Amino acid sequence: MIALEIYVSGNVQGVGFRYFTRRVARELGIKGYVKNLPDGRVYIYAVGEELTLDKFLSAVKSGPPLATVRGVEVKKAEIENYESFEVAY
């Protein structure tokens, strides 16, 4: 298991990006959360197996139909215990 902090920039707020991310994460069994940041980016904290997180990152880089992803920054993080994947506010 590994944990990642993911920062997504572009047109990613107000276009269903967080709910898209939650759906994909739950389908893949990834734990953590997603939230909007005040600077217009989306922050994702994700815990899972490395291969599963690779699939997740591919989906995040594409985003939902109305989103335009311009950048994705990924950092390794400390593993925290989450029961599920949620949208944080």
From Swiss-Prot:
It comes from the Archaea. Gene3D superfamilies: 3.30.70.100. Its EC number is 3.6.1.7. The active site is at residues 18, 36. It catalyses: an acyl phosphate + H2O = a carboxylate + phosphate + H(+). Residues 3-89 form the Acylphosphatase-like domain. Keywords: Hydrolase. One of its GO terms (molecular function) is acylphosphatase activity. Pfam families: Acylphosphatase. Signal peptide: none annotated. InterPro entries: Acylphosphatase (IPR020456), Acylphosphatase-like_dom (IPR001792), Acylphosphatase-like_dom_sf (IPR036046), Acylphosphatase_CS (IPR017968). Belongs to the acylphosphatase family. This is Acylphosphatase. The lineage of its organism: Archaea, Methanobacteriati, Methanobacteriota, Archaeoglobi, Archaeoglobales.
